[in-house]
């Protein structure tokens, strides 16, 4: 386990060399419309019908202790079957986070891996950060959860939401969308919680 954890830190150090995370502040003066807007409700229904999906993009992470950026490959099937692969465009290093029926497995391209039934514990132990991957599938496609406090923008798409998970308040701002595809899907997302910022750019929605 120590070898894998050390290797994860090395991978993040490599990814750090390509880090370029900007626009960390939440947008202001955003105009909202009613959640009962017909166009939004139709879009919301479409999002709920998207059960499994793949997406490719980039993410940048900033905390008081570290920062890094990386490419990602997200393959989602259901809450117990998804894979998040992190990799750099300037090296061969990769890190894979896989959810399965028995729990979670984190592995690298050198064959080292660690598994645990408690996914949150494993992420905290190996990656060193708390991130609600179980909610990520909804957040990435711009679908607010039923218990989230959200706002709809003038573009009739999700603009922002706030959600408390394990006592931590999370906010998400949807900065831009791929509007030339149907349905429109998020392009740039800014996630924040106490001392952590995650900026996501989805380059391709593969469905």
Swiss-Prot record:
<dbReference type="GO" id="GO:0009279">
    <property type="term" value="C:cell outer membrane"/>
</dbReference>
<comment type="subunit">
    <text>Monomer.</text>
</comment>
<keyword id="KW-0998">Cell outer membrane</keyword>
<dbReference type="GO" id="GO:0044874">
    <property type="term" value="P:lipoprotein localization to outer membrane"/>
</dbReference>
<comment type="similarity">
    <text>Belongs to the LolB family.</text>
</comment>
<keyword id="KW-0732">Signal</keyword>
<keyword id="KW-0564">Palmitate</keyword>
<dbReference type="Pfam" id="PF03550">
    <property type="entry name" value="LolB"/>
</dbReference>
<dbReference type="GO" id="GO:0015031">
    <property type="term" value="P:protein transport"/>
</dbReference>
<comment type="function">
    <text>Plays a critical role in the incorporation of lipoproteins in the outer membrane after they are released by the LolA protein.</text>
</comment>
<feature type="signal peptide">
    <location>
        <begin position="1"/>
        <end position="19"/>
    </location>
</feature>
<protein>
    <recommendedName>
        <fullName>Outer-membrane lipoprotein LolB</fullName>
    </recommendedName>
</protein>
<feature type="lipid moiety-binding region" description="N-palmitoyl cysteine">
    <location>
        <position position="20"/>
    </location>
</feature>
<feature type="lipid moiety-binding region" description="S-diacylglycerol cysteine">
    <location>
        <position position="20"/>
    </location>
</feature>
<keyword id="KW-0472">Membrane</keyword>
<keyword id="KW-0653">Protein transport</keyword>
<dbReference type="InterPro" id="IPR004565">
    <property type="entry name" value="OM_lipoprot_LolB"/>
</dbReference>
<keyword id="KW-0449">Lipoprotein</keyword>
<keyword id="KW-0143">Chaperone</keyword>
<keyword id="KW-0813">Transport</keyword>
<dbReference type="InterPro" id="IPR029046">
    <property type="entry name" value="LolA/LolB/LppX"/>
</dbReference>
């Amino acid at each position: 386990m120590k070898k894998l954890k050390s290797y994860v830190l090395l991978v993040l150090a490599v990814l750090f060399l390509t880090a370029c995370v900007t626009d960390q502040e939440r947008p202001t003066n955003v105009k909202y419309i009613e959640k009962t807007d017909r166009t939004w409700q139709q879009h919301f229904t479409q999002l709920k019908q998207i059960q499994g999906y793949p997406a490719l993009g980039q993410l940048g992470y900033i905390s008081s202790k570290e920062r890094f950026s990386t490419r990602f490959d997200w393959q989602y099937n259901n809450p117990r079957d998804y894979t998040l692969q992190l990799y750099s465009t300037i090296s061969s290093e990769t890190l894979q986070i896989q959810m399965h029926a028995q729990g979670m497995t984190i592995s690298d391209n050198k064959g080292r891996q660690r598994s645990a039934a408690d996914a949150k514990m494993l992420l905290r132990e190996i990656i060193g950060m708390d991130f609600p991957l179980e909610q990520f599938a909804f957040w990435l496609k711009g679908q607010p959860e039923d218990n989230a406090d959200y706002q709809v923008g003038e573009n009739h798409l999700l603009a922002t939401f706030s959600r408390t998970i394990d006592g931590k308040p999370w906010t998400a701002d949807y900065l831009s969308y791929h509007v030339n595809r149907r349905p429109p899907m998020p392009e740039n997302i800014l996630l924040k919680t106490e001392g952590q910022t995650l900026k996501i750019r989805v380059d391709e929605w593969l469905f």
